[in-house]
């Protein structure tokens, strides 16, 4: 659903107040957090979508990694999950089994128990997880925690929406995008695991609203301005080439329509870069706000494990009447 339509629907919903609900949908966070102890929160999220690849096992891996990411984005660790599978009967049990096996593979890697699930017949396959986990409340992260002076760390390259659109249009072969699919299958656990002893202020995962959209939510939730250094943002191979050809997914245009009025971009950006920044991601990385020294140390630890980590911006004082996000070259 387009972000503007989603905001309208959620704004009209009645709800029952509960003091133990520490994070709900009103702050556009990645998951809910419900207090279950003095320093313990139950983190819950749900996510599912149709396939972007032909390989059912790979699809299951990507969908599960994407679902698990919301728990990591809150600073938590997933504990158990429920499968959600929509499958056409014509695809048969073998395809369904491969999708579920791909999801199970990522859950085992995450140490997350699959406790059950639900399946329905549908015209188009869709898969994902309802995931629960736990977080120490004094280590809980939210997209509203960014502070002026923080640096911003991004833990995966972007451009998956553009590249998968190019694959569907037969402009790129799927095997040319192997590094991108490996990234989409990679769990977002490492930045949280490796942040031990570091001070993190805010976090969100970069998914359907694109890097700009999620940065905008972080800026508005934290009452700050985010400056994105576009030249520092890691991109998958051929992203800018495809963007310059106009290979842009529909979700990118929806993101531009909704977030664009709150974004200012310098005129000297590299051609195609703004499209890449609005590009909706599947199983994208984490965008972390933290003091510069802690960001540098976390990046060093991630690089030591061979992982992507790029300082892509900073958190600034808000400008009255100004943009939530300022994109510079």
What is each PLM-predicted segment?
Residues 21-23, 31-34, 70-72, 104, ...:
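A generic local secondary-structure boundary/capping motif
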Residues 89-113, 120-127, 197, 207-329:
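Glycine-/charge-enriched secondary-structure boundary and capping motifs
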Residues 36-53, 58, 77-172, 314-316, ...:
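Glycine-rich anion-binding loops of enzyme active sites
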Residues 56-82, 98-109, 187-199, 206, ...:
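Small-aliphatic-rich amphipathic alpha-helix that forms the alpha element of a beta-alpha
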Residues 164-178, 305-308:
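Short, compositionally biased
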Residues 130-140, 175-195, 269:
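Active-site glycine-rich loop that binds ribose-phosphate moieties when present
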Residues 1-73, 112, 147-153, 157, ...:
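N-terminal glycine-rich phosphate/pyrophosphate-binding loops that anchor nucleotide-derived ligands
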Residues 57, 176-183, 201-202, 273-278:
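Short pre-catalytic strand/loop immediately N-terminal to key active-site residues, enriched for Gly-Thr
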């Amino acid at each position: 659903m387009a972000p503007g339509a989603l905001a309208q629907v959620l704004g009209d919903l009645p709800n029952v107040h509960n003091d133990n609900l520490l994070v709900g949908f009103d702050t556009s966070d990645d998951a809910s957090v419900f207090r279950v102890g003095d320093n313990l929160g139950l983190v819950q999220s749900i996510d599912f979508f149709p396939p972007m690849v032909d390989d059912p096992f790979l699809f299951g891996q990507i969908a599960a990694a994407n679902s698990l990411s919301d728990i990591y984005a809150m600073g938590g660790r997933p504990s158990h999950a429920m499968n959600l599978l929509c499958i056409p009967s014509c695809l048969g049990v073998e395809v369904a089994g491969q999708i579920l096996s791909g999801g199970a593979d990522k859950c085992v890697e995450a140490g997350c128990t699959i406790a059950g699930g639900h399946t329905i017949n549908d015209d188009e396959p869709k898969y994902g997880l309802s995931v629960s986990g736990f977080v120490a409340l004094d280590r809980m992260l939210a997209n509203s925690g960014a502070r002026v002076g923080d640096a911003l760390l991004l833990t995966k390259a972007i451009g998956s929406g553009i590249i998968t659109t190019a694959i569907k249009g037969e402009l790129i072969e799927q095997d040319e995008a192997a590094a991108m699919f490996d990234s989409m299958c990679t769990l977002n656990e490492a930045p949280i695991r490796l942040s031990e002893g570091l001070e993190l202020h805010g976090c969100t995962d970069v998914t359907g609203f694109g890097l700009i959209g999620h940065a905008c939510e972080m800026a508005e939730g934290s009452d700050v301005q985010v400056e994105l250094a576009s030249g520092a943002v890691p991109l998958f191979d051929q992203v800018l080439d495809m963007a310059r050809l106009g290979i842009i997914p529909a979700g990118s245009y929806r993101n531009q329509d909704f977030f664009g009025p709150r974004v200012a971009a310098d005129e000297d950006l590299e051609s195609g870069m703004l499209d890449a920044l609005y590009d909706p991601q599947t199983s994208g990385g984490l965008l972390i706000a933290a003091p510069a020294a802690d960001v540098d140390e976390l990046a060093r630890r991630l690089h030591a494990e061979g992982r992507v980590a790029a300082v892509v911006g900073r958190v600034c004082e808000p400008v009255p009447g100004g943009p939530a996000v300022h994109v510079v070259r």
